[in-house]
């Protein structure tokens, strides 16, 4: 992986219709329809909207052979209107539907968790090695005929592993782990290689960004060990909608793109599918800006493992560092003192002097030469002022540094002064690589100074600010780096930056400040109005800080993706909902119009409600 210097991973090419993926091809953008696959007119119309919004592949669900066959009619009508963008069939539980779809569309996605193995029941199964090998042979017996159909029609496949739909067989041997997800994928990849089938794309997805990133990195490492280089499809499942969905997607997808990993992406939003393409395009374009950047000379700290990261050990300075949650520092040097009480920062930076309208009860960062001793104000230095740190008698001092400032003398100062916190900035085009280099230099020097990650942007587009800051900060946080965040942006109100920082910390699971919603983007299997339902559930429960609520269109990934959710709302049929407490379905087939109220009642009955 390209850890310090950005380079795309060298993948093999999968031929998908007339739009190949991998190799030197651009990172492709795709999405999935949410209308019924049997509603041909609606499906064609939505596909056209997605294509015109930038989709390079369009996916439809195919629950059975009937839906799979109808994809041929959708393909035909799109061709007649001049749209040749490859179509993809999404298959769960039904290998016969995969066989049928292989003759109708350019690519078929199968899920190893439910292609041959029995439906997930969360049961623990015991296998001898011989019995386990026999189960894999069953996969081969069913999978090879499907590959032969694909060969005959020039159809590509995606082996799409979801965290939420690992089989009981895999779960029993590996547990709910990255190793289990990778093992599930590799069973199918080895058969593809043995059968000389090259047009394969892989995805390993999860709603938990930590799990998703670690697992994809482990998959790449495992494939390299077996000399496999298949292209990768990236996505965060059940990312949600609005700001949360964009930030969570950018954290997971952006981190891997920063590593040089990924040949196609889907930003899974609980919104209309055509809304996903502009978001995905902005994210890809931002990462590509660092191509051919000035090289960063750096070394990785011995023992650091990108697959098994943990938070860097830092000393504690006035509640910053150690095991304390990362702090949020808001740059208010512009004089903007409007705040959102749901995202109040821990500190504010005011720059050179105290403005007249300075709010009370905030801890302040003040430029060192303008600092006056008082209980809630702390001096902020720049690199050239480092020798002056010892002249200031206060319990907390900040110093703004870049990677290039970390000289031997600077490291001596940082080690000696136990009251200092670093604001780690970057001016490099590959800011992530530069800040990674700085963190590894601190590790190798044995310097445990707390580090607040700092970035500057000039964005008037709020969505672009969310994507850029989430990709950059998220990458470092998932590496285990960062005792806080400081985001300065010229172009939007400061409160927008504050919300971004709290959203990024939530998405990386480093600091929980609000309710977390694990909501799917919906597809043709969803039989209720997902977007309206999400809005109603959020309105009723958004004050329940730290609670995780899953909102799923159907049972395909629902119970599994909600495995670490406290409560779940899952479509059970047309107009019917099932409610979950953890993994257990506690209320079945509730009328949709009553389901949100019953969810609130369930939360209250279990003692998790606050007024």
Swiss-Prot record:
A molecular function (GO) held by this record is: 4-hydroxy-3-methylbut-2-en-1-yl diphosphate synthase activity (ferredoxin)
Q: Which residues bind [4Fe-4S] cluster?
A: 520, 523, 554, 561
Q: Which reaction does it catalyse?
A: (2E)-4-hydroxy-3-methylbut-2-enyl diphosphate + oxidized [flavodoxin] + H2O + 2 H(+) = 2-C-methyl-D-erythritol 2,4-cyclic diphosphate + reduced [flavodoxin]
The UniProt family comment states: Belongs to the IspG family.
Cofactor names: [4Fe-4S] cluster
Tell me the Gene Ontology biological-process terms attached to this UniProt entry: isopentenyl diphosphate biosynthetic process, methylerythritol 4-phosphate pathway; terpenoid biosynthetic process
Is Oxidoreductase one of the keywords UniProt gives this record? yes
Q: Which keywords has UniProt assigned to this entry?
A: 4Fe-4S, Iron, Iron-sulfur, Isoprene biosynthesis, Metal-binding, Oxidoreductase
Report the protein's function: Converts 2C-methyl-D-erythritol 2,4-cyclodiphosphate (ME-2,4cPP) into 1-hydroxy-2-methyl-2-(E)-butenyl 4-diphosphate.
Enzymatic class: oxidoreductase
User: How and how many cofactors are bound, per the record note?
Assistant: Binds 1 [4Fe-4S] cluster.
Which gene is transcribed and translated to give this protein?
Answer: ispG
Q: In what pathway does it function? A: Isoprenoid biosynthesis; isopentenyl diphosphate biosynthesis via DXP pathway; isopentenyl diphosphate from 1-deoxy-D-xylulose 5-phosphate: step 5/6
What is this protein called in UniProt? Answer: 4-hydroxy-3-methylbut-2-en-1-yl diphosphate synthase (flavodoxin)
- Look up the domain of life of the source: Bacteria
Q: What is its EC number?
A: 1.17.7.3
């Amino acid at each position: 992986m390209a850890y310090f210097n950005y380079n795309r991973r060298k993948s093999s090419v999968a031929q998908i219709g007339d739009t190949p993926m991998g190799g030197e091809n651009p990172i492709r953008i795709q999405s999935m329809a949410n209308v019924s696959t049997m509603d041909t007119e609606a499906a064609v119309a939505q596909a056209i909207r997605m294509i015109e919004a930038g989709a390079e592949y369009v996916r439809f669900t195919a629950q059975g052979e009937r839906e799979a066959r109808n994809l041929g009619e959708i393909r035909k009508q799109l061709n007649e209107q001049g749209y040749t963008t490859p179509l993809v069939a999404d298959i769960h539980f039904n290998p016969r539907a995969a066989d049928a779809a292989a003759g109708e569309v350019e690519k078929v996605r199968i899920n190893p968790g439910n292609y041959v193995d029995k439906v997930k029941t969360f049961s623990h199964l015991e296998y001898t090695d011989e019995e386990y090998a026999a189960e894999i042979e069953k996969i081969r017996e069913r999978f090879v005929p499907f590959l032969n159909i694909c060969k005959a029609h020039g159809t590509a496949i995606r082996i799409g592993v979801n965290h939420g739909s690992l089989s009981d067989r895999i779960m029993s041997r590996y547990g709910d782990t990255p190793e289990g997800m990778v093992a599930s994928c590799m069973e199918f990849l080895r058969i593809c290689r043995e059968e000389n089938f090259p047009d394969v794309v892989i995805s390993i997805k999860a709603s938990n960004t930590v799990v998703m990133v670690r697992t994809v990195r482990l998959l790449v490492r495992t494939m390299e060990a077996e000399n496999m280089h298949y292209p990768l499809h990236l996505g965060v499942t059940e990312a949600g909608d609005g700001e949360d969905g964009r930030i969570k997607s950018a954290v997971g997808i952006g981190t891997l793109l920063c590593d040089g990993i990924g040949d196609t992406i889907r930003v899974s939003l609980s919104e209309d599918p055509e809304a996903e393409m502009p978001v995905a395009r902005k994210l890809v374009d931002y990462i590509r800006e660092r191509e051919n950047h000035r090289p960063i000379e750096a070394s990785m700290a011995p023992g650091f493992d990108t697959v098994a990261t943990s938070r860097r050990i830092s000393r504690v300075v006035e509640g910053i560092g150690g095991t304390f949650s990362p702090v949020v520092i808001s740059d208010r040097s512009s004089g903007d003192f409007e705040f959102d009480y749901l995202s109040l920062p821990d500190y504010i930076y005011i720059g050179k002097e105290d403005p007249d309208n300075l709010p009370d009860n905030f801890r302040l960062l003040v430029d060192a030469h303008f600092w006056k001793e008082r209980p809630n104000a702390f001096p902020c230095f720049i690199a050239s002022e480092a020798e002056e740190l010892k002249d200031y008698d206060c319990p907390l001092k900040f110093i703004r540094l870049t990677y290039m400032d970390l000289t031997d003398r600077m490291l001596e100062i940082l080690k000696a002064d136990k009251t200092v916190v670093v604001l780690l900035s970057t001016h490099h085009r590959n800011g992530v690589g530069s800040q990674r280099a700085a963190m590894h230099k601190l590790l190798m020097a044995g310097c445990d100074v707390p580090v607040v990650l700092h970035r500057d942007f000039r964005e008037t587009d709020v969505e672009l600010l969310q994507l850029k800051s989430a990709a950059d900060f998220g990458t470092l946080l998932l590496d285990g780096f960062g005792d806080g965040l400081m985001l300065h942006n010229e172009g939007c109100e400061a409160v927008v930056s504050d919300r971004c920082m709290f959203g990024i910390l939530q998405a990386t699971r480093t600091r929980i400040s609000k309710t977390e919603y694990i909501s799917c983007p919906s597809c043709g299997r969803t039989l209720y109005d997902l977007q309206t339902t999400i809005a109603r559930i959020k309105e009723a429960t958004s004050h329940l800080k730290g609670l995780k609520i899953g909102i799923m269109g159907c049972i395909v990934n629902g119970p599994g993706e909600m495995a670490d959710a406290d409560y779940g709302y899952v479509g059970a049929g047309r107009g019917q909902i099932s409610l979950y407490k953890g993994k257990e379905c506690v209320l079945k087939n509730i009328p949709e119009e009553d389901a949100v109220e019953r969810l609130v009642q369930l939360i209250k009955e279990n003692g998790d409600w606050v007024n």
